[in-house]
């Protein structure tokens, strides 16, 4: 065996069939599409179901998007334990600590988990249980 005699194994490399290139090519004339009809012609548009009422028109339209909706970044109490005792927790400090990814319309503190440190928490909204838990731990809440 010599390098110049190397050949790919039989059947591993085949040329692609170029369709519609004359009758003697084997895939000329109808190009493997059979005779006439919708499938022999161009593509049907997206969502077309052969004349049947398409799914996107059978299903009713529902609801709307409220342009005035405010979306708050949610923070639970157990996430606040990363801050030092007596620290002031603001939306900026939460962003810096990586607890929230973006500020959105503001920050809402919820009462899931336990808080073990005395903190001053400044946020746009608080749940009742969060306020009780923060004050029970000796901290303060402030709506900004």
Curated annotation (Swiss-Prot):
InterPro entries: Ribosomal_uL15, Ribosomal_uL15/eL18, Ribosomal_uL15/eL18_sf, Ribosomal_uL15_bac-type, Ribosomal_uL15_CS
One Pfam family hit: Ribosomal_L27A
Domain of life: Bacteria
Kinase as UniProt keyword: no
GO MF annotations in UniProt: rRNA binding; structural constituent of ribosome
Region of interest (Disordered), ranges: 1-44
GO term, biological process aspect, one: translation
Keywords: Ribonucleoprotein, Ribosomal protein, RNA-binding, rRNA-binding
Biological role: Binds to the 23S rRNA.
Similarity section: Belongs to the universal ribosomal protein uL15 family.
Name of the protein in its database record: Large ribosomal subunit protein uL15
Gene: rplO
């Amino acid at each position: 065996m010599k390098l110049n005699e190397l050949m790919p194994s039989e059947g591993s490399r085949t040329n692609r069939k170029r369709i519609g290139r004359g009758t003697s090519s084997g895939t000329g004339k109808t190009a493997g599409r059979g005779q006439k009809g919708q499938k022999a012609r161009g593509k049907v548009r997206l969502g077309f179901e052969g004349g049947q009422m398409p799914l996107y028109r059978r299903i009713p339209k529902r609801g709307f998007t409220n342009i005035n909706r405010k979306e708050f970044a949610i923070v639970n109490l157990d996430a606040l334990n990363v801050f030092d005792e007596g620290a002031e927790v603001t939306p900026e400090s939460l962003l810096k600590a990586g607890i929230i990814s973006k500020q959105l319309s503001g920050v809402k503190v919820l009462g899931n988990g336990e808080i073990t440190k005395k903190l001053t928490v400044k946020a746009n909204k608080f749940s009742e249980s969060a306020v009780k838990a923060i004050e029970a731990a000796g901290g303060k809440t402030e709506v900004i």
